[in-house]
């Protein structure tokens, strides 16, 4: 979870949070070295080309949320590979499928991923609703920044919805394979 203030993002996470560590490394790579450090540093280890620092704490929150959803996609890919293997095994005639415990665990993981994504989708939708209620900024630059924040928020929301769609498709696919196996 996050508490978003004008200039501060307060993340709430477990102690061993890989997302926090990954994003901290990404931020460090995007930050150019101080002029005094430049001479002592290898020029290839500077800032990542094309990387931008977040414009605000809200932008940082959305980037971290996007990284989290990217990890959901990776988890979905791993589950998909394993479920495809089991599905092929289930559909092979005259074979005895014996991996029921692992299959049920994978289904449970899919359900949990679906629930987490639904919670995040609800939170992001509430965030978007709150953004719509913000007073319009006076300056064109601030207005552009607000518009970019809304666009990035919708992008992350769509990213979450893609994960949910894939998870539900996998659930349906494996349930169909189990039904065919027993018919």
Name each model feature, range by range.
Residues 93-96, 149, 156, 174, ...:
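Alpha-helical heptad-repeat coiled-coil segments that mediate oligomerization/polymerization in large
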Residues 134-146:
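Short helix-coil transition/hinge motifs at the ends and kinks of transmembrane helices
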Residues 165-183:
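Membrane-interface, cytosolic juxtamembrane amphipathic helix immediately N-terminal to a transmembrane helix
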Residues 120-124, 142-145, 171-174:
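A glycine-rich, aromatic-flanked flexible loop/lid motif
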Residues 1-136, 155, 159-164, 169:
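Peripheral, non-transmembrane regulatory/ligand-interaction domains of membrane transport proteins
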Residues 56, 146-147:
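General structural signal for secondary-structure boundaries
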